[in-house]
Regions:
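A conserved acidic beta->alpha catalytic loop
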Residues: 37-46, 95
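Donor nucleotide-sugar binding loop of glycosyltransferases
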Residues: 13-16, 40, 98
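Short beta-strand/loop segment that forms part of the nucleotide-sugar
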Residues: 8, 30-40, 61-62, 91
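Short glycine/serine/threonine-enriched helix-capping/active-site loop
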Residues: 90, 116-118, 200-202
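Catalytic donor-sugar/metal-binding loop of nucleotide-sugar-dependent glycosyltransferases
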Residues: 151, 174-178, 187-203
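Short, well-formed alpha-helical segments that are part of the catalytic scaffolds
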Residues: 13-26
Length: 232
């Protein structure tokens, strides 16, 4: 089995990381984890370093401050490409994404180039979100699909698997978006470059521990990103 890297951006995830990483690694020896930590004051990076002492498949990038989701994933993608990983995953640290679903993403990635764990491909599969946030997310995805023409029902989700060749085709240094906009941009560029995208249904459960990182700025950025992609 070709090596897999699960990239997990973190900011104050000390409650979740010690539980999450062992679950991922127990899925098989081909799974590695890269934590990209943005200077978490709660000691997230310190916990990861302790785990690294006994597990060589855990990797860590420490950054000086809160630099954003998009740049964290770009750093992770560059690490994956530089270290020979074939399948590169995005995943939240807070158990919103079920780590047991990673093998399903990997299985579909044998056939497709980008596999998206989709909240909306088979109805609406979201747990613990207030109605306003759910409508905002669902509406943003309908809006994205209409404006860009991209045939993806969950363009803003962050649980996915890229084949190496997809990331190699994208100028990662030109990616400057964050949050929803980052997910939309990566999906769009993968699709525009001719790669095969596929969605599988997942259940998204709002974070187990900690505080949500959602903000109005993330939403506004996504609204403008859709038009930027449309006119390029």
């Amino acid at each position: 089995m070709n090596r897999c890297l699960v990239v997990i951006p973190t900011f104050n995830e000390a409650d979740n990381v010690p539980q999450l990483l062992p679950i991922i690694l127990n899925l098989g020896d081909h799974f590695n984890v890269l934590v990209v930590d943005d200077g978490s004051p709660d000691g997230t990076a310190k916990l990861v370093k302790e785990m690294q002492k006994t597990e060589p498949r855990i990797h860590l990038i420490e950054r000086a401050g809160k630099m954003g989701l998009g740049t964290a994933y770009v750093a992770g993608f560059k690490f994956a490409l530089a270290n020979g990983f074939e399948f590169i995953f995005e995943m939240d640290a807070d158990f919103s994404h079920d780590p047991q679903e990673l093998p399903r993403l990997l299985d579909k990635a044998q056939t497709y180039d980008l596999v998206i764990g989709s909240r909306y491909i088979s109805g609406v599969n979201v747990v613990n979100w207030p109605l306003r946030r759910l409508m905002l997310s669902y509406g943003a995805n309908v809006y994205t699909r209409i404006i860009t023409g991209m045939p993806v029902r969950d363009a803003t989700g962050g649980f996915k698997c890229f084949r190496r060749k997809v990331l190699e085709s994208i100028d990662l240094d030109a990616i400057h978006s964050n949050g929803y906009a980052f997910q939309i941009e990566m999906n769009f560029k993968s699709w525009r470059n001719g790669f095969k995208l596929h969605e599988i249904p997942i259940v998204f459960t709002d974070r187990r521990n900690g505080v949500s990182k959602m903000s109005k700025q993330i939403v506004y950025e996504a609204v403008w990103m859709v038009w930027r992609l449309k006119i390029k």
